[in-house]
């Protein structure tokens, strides 16, 4: 909201667009007021649900569901300025969606966004680029079907304490410290 309210409204037509956790888009003037976000359910109920549509290389916000015999195009969009946080938006998913619409957007592309959310892949890239990074190991959900093998692999490579973190959640979500085997089993 701060970024939107500080853009040059004389130069740009700024259209607020909210993406819900259910992956539904909403627009409306109330999205410009930070205080409205205190009650998301009420804010959404006071906003217009829309979808993004590309038609003949132009992008539009279109009322959803469509209304018969009514103007359904809410606005044309020239560029998206995604200011987002969380799953399906920081990881390249939103950027990929915008790319499928051929809708220009600011910020990282699909690859860079995905890489930025994948802690293991980012670590490998940084290491290959010559940056000092701590050693690590990665395990898949399939690997965890045999937890004893995972624990043995960790213990053969590292001394306790060890830090366990999900590969692709937010920067500190799900991180735990294991001081011993019992702690590692819980992590």
Annotate the PLM regions:
Residues 125-133:
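Basic phosphate/pyrophosphate-binding loop/patch that engages nucleotide-derived ligands
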Residues 75, 131, 158:
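Structured loop/turn residues at beta-strand edges in well-structured enzyme cores
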Residues 148-153, 177, 181:
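Charged helix-capping and loop-helix junction motifs
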Residues 112, 186-187:
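An N-terminal domain-start capping segment
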Residues 151-162:
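Acidic/histidine-enriched active-site and ligand-binding environments that engage anionic O-linkages
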Residues 133-138, 162-186:
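Glycine-rich phosphate-binding loop of ATP-grasp-fold ATP-dependent ligases
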